[in-house]
Amino acid sequence: MGHTIKAPLTVQGVGLHSGVETTVTLCPVAAGKGRYFQRVDLPKKPIIPADLTWVREAMLSTELGEPGATIRTVEHLLATLVALDIGDLRIEVNGPEVPLLDGSALSWLTAIAKVGTRPRSKKSQDQPIVITDPLTCQLEDAFVAAFPCATTRFSYGVDYPYLPIGKQWYTWEPDQENFATAIAPARTFGFADQIEKLRQAGLIKGGSLENALVCDKEKWLNPPLRFPDEPVRHKLLDLLGDLSLLGKIPQAHFVAYKASHKLHTQLAQKIADTYR
C-alpha cells in the first residue's frame, strides 16, 4: 500500500440507509498504520480498522465494527482508496454511515485529487497476494471466484428481471482502463417496486433520485446513464471496495455473477484464510 494523502480533507453528505447527514474527514497517517475509521461522535472515539476481521454485516452494503461502534456503507470510499493505492489513512466519521454522495465513487476521487497523494517509503510497501489455485464462493446460481492470472482483472455479470438492465457483463483490467473513467462514475441503483419494502425494513432512508439510479420494469426513472452498462460497472465498484478489506487487491482474475456484498466478503475471507 504505497500512498497516503498530502493534507486532510472533509466531505459531507447523507447516508443511504440511515438518512443521517455525516461529515467525513480523511487524515494522512504514518506508514504502516493502515486504513481505519474513527467514530469521532462516540465516547472514546473508537477505531474501526478497514479489515476483514471487522466485517459485521453485508446486507445491501458493507458494515464494519463491533457492538456500539459501527460504520456502514464503506465500500465506495474503500474502492477509491485501494484503486489509488492509498494504504495509510484515518477516516474520521461523526455518524454511523459513510455518505452516499452521488451514489458513485467520483466525489471521493475528486476530493482526493484536490489535496493530492504522497508515496510512502519503499521499505514499507507490502506485496499483494498472488492467487495460485481457484477459490469460489457460491449461493444458488450466484457466485464470486478468484482464478490464477498473470495480471489483476475483474469480470462481473448481472441478470435482473427489469428491462432497463437485463443481462450485462463487463470486464475491467486496471492496467488497461483507468479507474477514474471506467469504474468510479458508476452509480448505485435500485428498483422502484422494492423501495417501500426496503424503507419499511429501516433501509434506504437517505436514498433519492439524486443519489441512485432507479428503474421500474420498463424504464429508468432518472436518466441519462453515464454508461449503457452502468449497473454492472457499479457492482464491480462494490466488489473492489469489499476486496480492499484484504489490504491490497490480490493478483487474480476475479469473476462474479449475481453476487452480493456477502459473497464478496466471503471470498475475501477465503483468500485470507488460504494465503495468510
Curated annotation (Swiss-Prot):
GO terms for molecular function: metal ion binding; UDP-3-O-acyl-N-acetylglucosamine deacetylase activity. Signal peptide: none annotated. GO terms for cellular component: membrane. Its cofactor is Zn(2+). It comes from the Bacteria. Pathway: Glycolipid biosynthesis; lipid IV(A) biosynthesis; lipid IV(A) from (3R)-3-hydroxytetradecanoyl-[acyl-carrier-protein] and UDP-N-acetyl-alpha-D-glucosamine: step 2/6. Zn(2+) binds at residues 76, 234, 238. GO terms for biological process: lipid A biosynthetic process. The active site is at 261 (proton donor). It catalyses: a UDP-3-O-[(3R)-3-hydroxyacyl]-N-acetyl-alpha-D-glucosamine + H2O = a UDP-3-O-[(3R)-3-hydroxyacyl]-alpha-D-glucosamine + acetate. Pfam families: LpxC. Catalyzes the hydrolysis of UDP-3-O-myristoyl-N-acetylglucosamine to form UDP-3-O-myristoylglucosamine and acetate, the committed step in lipid A biosynthesis. Belongs to the LpxC family. This is UDP-3-O-acyl-N-acetylglucosamine deacetylase. It comes from Synechocystis sp. (strain ATCC 27184 / PCC 6803 / Kazusa). The lineage of its organism: Bacteria, Bacillati, Cyanobacteriota, Cyanophyceae, Synechococcales.
